[in-house]
Amino acid sequence: MAERIVSPGVFTREKDLSFLPQGIGNIGAALIGPTEMGPAFVPTVVRNLGEFETIFGKDNQDFYVPYTAKQYLRNAGTLTIVRVLGLGGYSNDTITLGISGSGHAVAATLKPSRGASDPDNLEIAGPGSASLSDGGTKSSFTLTVQGTSYSLSFDSSSANYITKVFSDNPQDANKSLYVYSNFQNTQNGAGSSDTITIASSSDELFSFDYQEAATPYIQSQLVNSARTSLFKIRTLSHGSNINGKYRIGISDIKEAADVPGSDYGSFSLQVIVNNPGKNDDGVVLENFQNLNFDEDSQNYLPRVIGDKYTTIDSNGKLTNNGDYPNQSRYIRVSDYSNLTGISKELVPMGFAAPLNPHNVTLASSGGSGSMAFPTSSYLGTSADTGQLNSRGSYDQNAYYGLDFNNVDHQQLLAPLPTSAGAGNNITMSLEDAYGHDDASVLGSTYTDGSNLLTITGSDYRQLKFQVPFQGGFDGSNPAKARLTGTSIVGNNTQGFDLSSASATGSLSYIRAINAISNPDEFDINLLALPGVIHSIHSSVTNHAIDKIEARADAFFIMDGSHYSASIQTAIDDVKTIDSNYVATYYPWVKITDDVKGKPTWVPPSVVLPGVYANNDRIGQEWFAPAGLNRGGLTSVLEAKTRLTNLERDDLYENRVNP
């Protein structure tokens, strides 16, 4: 306790400094642009590079934000990221190839790649535009598309194997097609002389905005001849590539009678890395234990994992949805309204049929009948095959459910077109799976290899299954070119069209800028849009200027000119801008691309936020970054041009920083 000490004519007060007042939180920059993954349009604060990479992914040669974030976070501890994704989606044609010996099962699908003149509109499946030569077999067939013929094979040892002729990368610029889906197990199951068929199809529609990925409905055991749809799990990240990054495991399923002090059953839920053939495949990222469906319990599923998510309208207004804060870094619970008043005996025992990632019409030619996409199948559905590891031995840690090592099943982990249906896919239930004789090591109560699993008769360590994610979508055509560096043009920077205020890319960036425009909600002191250039993307940069001036508490580092701009052009490009909240720099600089490992030219805004962060760390905030200590560009190999004193003076006088 503070003590007051008194002496003649002098009064002093001793202050106890054991408890210091809480300081003001760090305020950092905001970066807007595309990233590999992460929540779209939701301003998200990261405090170190590891956190950034967990949420938004690592370096990507097509995007600038990851590089800029890495440089910035070396010198600062707070950074707000606003990821942009596509709006409106796309539609295009699909070539579907099947094999007759497998019941006309679909063997592969092809779509227009970046190499097509117009990937969104290339007609590849109309009358006469795609055809097969007569007599084509699995070993050798010829596909002709718009007058160009390709010698192909579904024999993986052939030099003409389909993925050796066509890439599976939609960004392939060398051919007009890429392999969208490749069902290798179906191909391997066909005979070498089985004939190849082709299906004509109309546009396949993905005409909607970006989406997160979701599991099929997790379903209960069979009660009165019916299964109850319980809940879904959704990813916090949006985008197409999130479908294949993770899978959900559900394990330790116990009936209520085996849970002391509860009228409800319980289970555990895991977030698992999905990366077949790699060292990290199967790594458990998160494990939530002893979950239940009792709304009054601290272990209530949505309460433990969380169900909150944020939506944003075209004006950038953010709306928070859900009741329980997210405790997971990867997922949230959704679609769980059926848990209200649920029968206490119900527990998760399977999931609904996965949806088909194609909705093409499959009337085939080159053979009889119609094609069908391969059907989902599940582990343990034949006698004594439950819980086998990759070596074929019993392993109590192995899951039932979808076989993620089956390459055909990996094709399910994809965006879902409009009106997607289950097709021939079927539901999965542990009650349709067999145990294993070696499960006797678990104790006296277990299910052997000749009997089906049950909630009452099986050991809880036998009751576990894994579930796929589907439906994550970038909101744009994956084959659209992603131009960077000196290739940036008005209608394409990193895959976004910013050529006018109404262009879809401009709408995405404007929505992201609006999201951080409220100073009462988001504290920032710096804004950068790496790769957005005022001279060719003025609809976006002018909007950013308006919002940053309205905030009046942050600074906008803006790229004024393209790589090719002369000094006079750089001056002319920004001469109408007179703002105390905007800075532009000249010229472009060369850095080392960490992904490609070679030098590349980038606009100044890619590197300058890191310089500002270093300046604020060793100098004073709001002091101009200058001199050898505070203005050094340590990551820059060279500038496009070495400026003379007179040229620097000319730039300074016209409000351009050299």
Residue ranges, per PLM feature:
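Subunit-assembly interface segments of extracellular/virion macromolecular structures
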Residues: 1-658
